Curated annotation (Swiss-Prot):
It is found in: Cell membrane. The gene is P2RY12. It comes from the Eukaryota. Gene3D superfamilies: Rhodopsin 7-helix transmembrane proteins. GO terms for molecular function: G protein-coupled ADP receptor activity. Disulfide bonds join C17-C270, C97-C175. This is P2Y purinoceptor 12. Keywords: Blood coagulation, Cell membrane, Disulfide bond, G-protein coupled receptor, Glycoprotein, Hemostasis, Membrane, Phosphoprotein, Receptor, Transducer, Transmembrane, Transmembrane helix. Residues 333-342 have a biased composition (Acidic residues).
Length: 342
């Protein structure tokens, strides 16, 4: 197995710029393997629990869409692991470029979009904690969810179709080598659109959590001295969303800008290009980590999910009865504490 590949000429240097692939062929496949098993177990469990919970709030609808997106992303990991470790033949690399890599980014931006919607929902819960969802709002949330999936699918499908060139050799170093001329143009357009999606949701998260922090501080000032410690502890939980967003998605999108410049323009020397490559791969792994961190959001912020999980862990046979109890509460008017209060 070749550990070092010749890539490109470094600006201002006639020697070839080489890159050590031991990290990407050994370390990252191991890290993705860990994510695959942890993510598959936790998200399969989350999927089972959410199938037992009725979609009685916008929050739960968005969480259900998130767990589906995460599970789809996780299912792409084995193909990436085999491809990066050079354990598969040329057709596997072609399949990764044409299908699984597209699905990976497709699900990434779906998750980003739903985290933005969940953030807006948490802000509304902070300012109007006793407002309940009505059927009209639930229908709107479902329609919005379908539109997000449809929009991202329509963006991603051409990337699959236009990755249609036959590889010149068995070892395809870049997926761009397999794209048609228009495929490269479309890929660039999609990259710009995805950047816009991220930055819009980035602003949503920043603005909403600034307002949430102000509201929680006002609430703390009003209730200071009353001794409502449990409420203060609950309030802190809402910040898990911004923590997941910043850990998983922000580093990649900040690293992506200089990395793209290093691929399209001669503005960095060889050492800088290699550093940017490793930074990009590291931050891409962090985006994958999101699939393992989202279950913490479900557990800490969704009481129905938390109760069902605890019941399942205590006694697996009681999970069905817990689900029936939840459904009975919903028929009787719902559990006012179904979501973690602000």
């Amino acid at each position: 197995m070749q550990a070092i590949d010749n890539l490109t000429s470094a600006p201002g240097n006639t020697s070839l710029c080489t890159r050590d692939y031991k990290i990407t062929q050994v370390l990252f496949p191991l890290l993705y393997t860990v994510l695959f098993f942890v993510g598959l177990i936790t998200n399969s469990l989350a999927m089972r629990i959410f199938f037992q919970i009725r979609s009685k709030s916008n929050f739960i609808i968005f969480l259900k869409n998130t767990v589906i997106s995460d599970l789809l992303m996780i299912l792409t990991f084995p193909f990436k692991i085999l491809s990066d470790a050079k354990l598969g033949a040329g057709p596997l690399r072609t399949f990764v470029c044409q299908v699984t890599s597209v699905i990976f980014y497709f699900t990434m931006y779906i998750s980003i979009s739903f985290l933005g919607l969940i953030t807006i929902d948490r802000y509304q819960k902070t300012t109007r904690p006793f407002k309940t969802s009505n059927p009209k709002n639930l229908l709107g949330a479902k329609i919005l969810s379908v539109l997000i999936w449809a929009f991202m699918f329509l963006l991603s499908l051409p990337n699959m179709i236009l990755t249609n060139r036959r590889p010149r050799d068995k070892n395809v170093k870049k997926c761009s080598f397999l794209k048609s001329e228009f495929g490269l143009v479309w890929h660039e357009i999609v990259n710009y659109i995805c950047q816009v999606i991220f930055w819009i949701n980035f602003l949503i998260v920043i603005v909403c959590y600034t307002l949430i922090t102000k509201e929680l501080y006002r609430s703390y000032v009003r209730t200071r001295g009353v001794g409502k410690v449990p409420r203060k502890k609950v309030n802190v939980k809402v910040f898990i969303i911004i923590a997941v967003f910043f850990i998983c998605f922000v580093p990649f999108h900040f690293a992506r800008i200089p990395y793209t410049l290093s691929q399209t323009r001669d503005v960095f020397d060889c050492a800088a290009e290699n550093t940017l490559f490793y930074v990009k791969e590291s931050t891409l792994w962090l985006t994958s980590l999101n699939a393992c961190l989202d279950p913490f959001i479900y557990f800490f912020l969704c009481k129905s999910f938390r109760n069902s999980l605890i019941s399942m862990l205590k006694c697996p046979n009681s999970a069905t009865s817990q689900s029936q109890d939840n459904r009975k509460k919903e028929q009787d008017g719902g559990d006012p504490n179904e979501e973690t209060p602000m």
